[in-house]
Amino acid sequence: VLSPADKSNVKGVFAKIGGQAEEYGADALERMFATYPQTKTYFPHFDLGKGSAQVKGHGKKVAAALVEAVNNIDDLAGALSKLSDLHAQKLRVDPVNFKLLGQCFLVVVATGNPALLTPEVHAPLDKFLCAVGTVLTAKYR
C-alpha cells in the first residue's frame, strides 16, 4: 500500500521526468529485451533493434500508462482496467514480465537521473511499479 508520502514521491519523480517519459519507456523496453530475451516472444512482428520506431512507439504507450497511473494513483485499478483486460484476455502476457519491465524502468530512472533516485524515492517508486504490475495481472484469474 502506498502511503501519502510514497504517492508524493512518485508524483515528484514523474514531474521531473515528464518530458522524457516516452524516451524512458522505450529505453526500459530495450533493456528488458536485452536482459530478458524471452520477453521478445510477445513482439514477433516488431523490429526490436536499438532505436526501432516500433519499440519507441510501444515505449510511448508504456509511458502513457504509467503517467495515467500516476495521475490516478488513488484508483490504479480503475485507471488501468482496460489495459489489464487487454493484457490478460487478449495478449496473454506472462505476468512476470510486468515486474521485469518495472525493474528496467527503475534502472532507466537511476541512470538518467542518479541524484533523483535516493533511497527515499527508490522504495516508493518500486512499490508503485509493483502495484501497477499487480493491477495489470489482477484479471488473469
UniProtKB/Swiss-Prot annotation:
Database matches in CDD domains: Hb-alpha-like (cd08927)
Annotated ranges, domain Globin: 1-141
GO-annotated cellular components: blood microparticle; haptoglobin-hemoglobin complex; hemoglobin complex
Keyword Mitochondrion attributed: no
Keyword list, A-Z: Heme, Iron, Metal-binding, Oxygen transport, Transport
Biological processes, Gene Ontology terms: hydrogen peroxide catabolic process
SUPFAM superfamilies: Globin-like
PROSITE patterns reported in the protein's UniProt record: GLOBIN
Tissues expressing this chain: Red blood cells.
Binding residues for O2: H58
Residues given in the record as heme b binding sites: H87
Gene Ontology molecular function terms on file: haptoglobin binding; heme binding; iron ion binding; organic acid binding; oxygen binding; oxygen carrier activity; peroxidase activity
Keyword Heme attributed: yes
One Pfam family linked to the record: Globin
Function (record text): Involved in oxygen transport from the lung to the various peripheral tissues.
SUBUNIT field: Heterotetramer of two alpha chains and two beta chains.
Entries under PANTHER family matching the protein: HEMOGLOBIN FAMILY MEMBER (PTHR11442), HEMOGLOBIN SUBUNIT ALPHA (PTHR11442:SF48)
Family: Belongs to the globin family.
Name this polypeptide is given: Hemoglobin subunit alpha-A
Chain's gene name: HBAA
